[in-house]
Amino acid sequence: MDPCECSKTGTCNCGGSCKCTNCSCTTCKKSCCPCCPSGCTKCASGCVCKGKTCDTSCCQ
């Protein structure tokens, strides 16, 4: 099974090798599913991604 179903379902099974593209998941940790831009100071390590822009709506 593909460990990363983000592009199909909007959710991820966060396996150690999960690499998401076109991420729309709301349950994945940033380390698994990099929704937020790298270097985004508002996206703390371990946050749950909600968006692709570096602002307060990026992560919950």
Swiss-Prot record:
Binding-site positions, a divalent metal cation 5: 33, 35-36, 49
Protein residues bound to a divalent metal cation 4: 32-33, 43, 47
Chain residues that bind a divalent metal cation 6: 36, 40, 43, 59
Region of interest: Alpha: 29-60
InterPro entries listed in its UniProt record: Metalthion_dom_sf, Metalthion_dom_sf_vert, Metalthion_vert, Metalthion_vert_metal_BS
Binding residue positions for a divalent metal cation 3: 14, 18, 23, 28
Function: Metallothioneins have a high content of cysteine residues that bind various heavy metals.
Protein name per Swiss-Prot or TrEMBL: Metallothionein
Organism: Zoarces viviparus (Viviparous eelpout)
